[in-house]
Regions:
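Walker A/P-loop-proximal flanking segment of P-loop NTPase domains
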Residues: 1-66, 73, 79, 233-263
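Extended, well-ordered alpha-helical scaffold/bundle regions in very large, multi-domain proteins
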Residues: 210-226, 230, 415-436
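Flexible phosphate/Mg2+-sensing switch loops adjacent to catalytic phosphate-binding sites
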Residues: 76-111, 139-153, 432-436
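C-terminal helical "lid" subdomain and adjoining coupling/linker elements of P-loop NTPases
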Residues: 182-185, 278-399, 412-423, 427-435
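Phosphate-handling catalytic cores of nucleic-acid transaction enzymes
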Residues: 2, 14-21, 48, 54, ...
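Mid-core helix/loop region of P-loop NTP-binding domains shared across ATPases and GTPases
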Residues: 138-176, 182-183, 192-204, 208
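Conserved P-loop NTPase catalytic core
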Residues: 100-123, 200-342
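Conserved P-loop NTPase mechanochemical-coupling segment
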Residues: 27, 109-151, 174-188
């Protein structure tokens, strides 16, 4: 529809996973990775917090699937390849009409070390530094050569010598997952050592920001893994700002499509006018809110905004899915199936009788057996209705679409489950109105 192109990774017969893993995301060219990165407020906040003249560690806080690893990979590339990052910021500055983007200062003097800690490559954090810092081998020798005076963890003096030799940005993904899994007994007090060592790193990052930039990710702030860093008042990126919802929509569109930003507002408005007009009439939107509703539809295209909200705020929460990550998979599968055929994609396009429509991707995200069984019940209802009118001339217009929309809306939280006839009517309306 309107020449919209899915990214290559979503065009194969088998839909690939959408998870960004820090270790693999840092292996390719910076320009290629930044090409699939939308400059959300959280991305920009992270890059700014790691910039010159800043003096606080950075903590990315959020549950799985919210994009922490993607942001860390973007920061890694921004620190490692200033030219590519500056070009990326300049390009988006023009696209978004925000001159401040291209003025965002970037560090260009840091040795960047990144590690996905959940891969369990290292038992101790200092081993990462000793193994991968240019001055690490020398500093390991100092520490291990202290004999009876050797401390349980390397001292701040040893670390300061290392970072003075070569200023460093240390990017630690899945820090909480790693920390919580550490042994902590009298014989093997590894978690206590990690707790002490992260305190030393945090204090160096605060007191000597020209020597160390520390960036870690955690799932939540109520863990010991976070407490020592919290003491030095870090910059917290938590995906909850006032722009978060709008940014998430833009991120979804940019991650899914190569050219969504190039489709004009006039083209979209013309394409979806019939559907939006009927939606406004059926839902009885007040006149004062109608322009706002039309803007919402235009911004969310090719998806209906109420469908995105339904998936994001109700279904994925109710089914304990991994938020943005699973939403990308679901929408990619859905667009591949119906995107070229309908002016706007609604809940009615989650066809219960067609596995290509994104149903499988959605069910893969469902943790609750009750939700998984709802599709079986919906299919039985579909067959029952068809059987009831078999052998008669009674038409059943839009039957599959109506039951599909009702099924999807029934996956929502109990207090929000189901739909009235006007909502279902709006869901099945395409480029022409349907008689009430």
């Amino acid at each position: 529809m309107l020449g919209l192109n899915l990214r290559n990774e979503f065009q194969g017969r088998r839909l690939k996973g959408t998870a960004i893993e820090l270790a693999s995301a840092t292996q390719g060219a910076a320009a290629d990775f930044l090409d699939i990165t939308y400059p959300t407020m959280d991305v920009l906040k992270t890059i700014e917090a790691a910039g010159p003249d800043q003096g606080r560690p950075v903590v990315l806080e959020g549950e799985r699937g919210q994009g922490k690893s993607h942001i860390m990979a973007a920061l890694y590339h921004a620190l490692n390849d200033n030219e590519a990052a500056a070009d990326w910021l300049s390009q988006w500055s023009g696209v978004l009409g925000d001159p401040k983007l291209k003025e965002l200062p970037l560090r260009n003097d840091m040795h960047v070390i990144s590690e996905s800690l959940h891969r369990q490559r290292y038992k101790h954090l200092w081993d990462i530094l000793f193994d991968r810092h240019p001055h690490g081998k020398y500093c390991r020798g100092i520490w291990e050569g202290q004999g009876n005076n050797k401390t349980d963890v390397p001292s701040d003096e040893i670390l300061l010598e290392m970072f003075t030799h070569t200023p460093t940005a240390l990017v630690l993904d899945e820090y909480q997952t790693w920390f919580d899994g550490l042994t902590n007994t009298k014989q093997y007090p590894w978690r206590t050592w990690a707790f002490n060592f992260i305190q030393i790193l945090s204090e160096i990052a605060k007191e000597h920001p020209e020597l160390l930039v520390l960036i870690v990710s955690v799932r939540n702030g109520g863990t010991d893994a976070f407490q020592q860093i919290q003491r030095v008042n870090p910059v917290i990126v938590d995906f909850k700002g006032p722009q978060a919802k709008h940014d998430r929509l833009r991120l979804l569109q940019h991650r899914l499509f190569e050219n969504r930003m190039q489709v004009s507002e006039e083209q979209i408005t013309s394409t979806i006018n019939a559907h939006v007009s009927e939606y406004i009439r059926l839902i009885n939107v007040p006149p004062a809110e109608q322009d706002h509703v039309r803007r919402d539809f235009c911004e969310a295209w090719p998806f209906a905004p109420h469908m995105i909200q339904l998936l994001e705020d109700q279904v994925l929460i109710a089914t304990h899915a991994q938020e943005t990550r699973d939403l990308i998979r679901i929408l990619a599968a859905l667009y591949k199936c119906v995107g070229e055929d309908v002016p706007v994609i609604t809940a009615a396009d989650f066809r219960i009788d067609d596995d290509r429509s994104g149903i499988n991707a959605l069910l893969d995200s469902v943790a609750n057996q009750h939700h998984a069984k709802l599709r079986e019940k919906a299919l039985r209802n579909l067959e029952s209705v068809k059987d009831a009118v078999s052998g008669t001339d009674q038409p059943l217009p839009h039957l599959e679409e109506i039951l599909s929309a009702l099924w999807l809306r029934s996956l929502a939280d109990v207090n929000q489950a189901g739909a009235d006839k006007h909502t279902l009517h709006a869901d099945i309306t395409r480029d022409v109105s349907i008689d009430d």
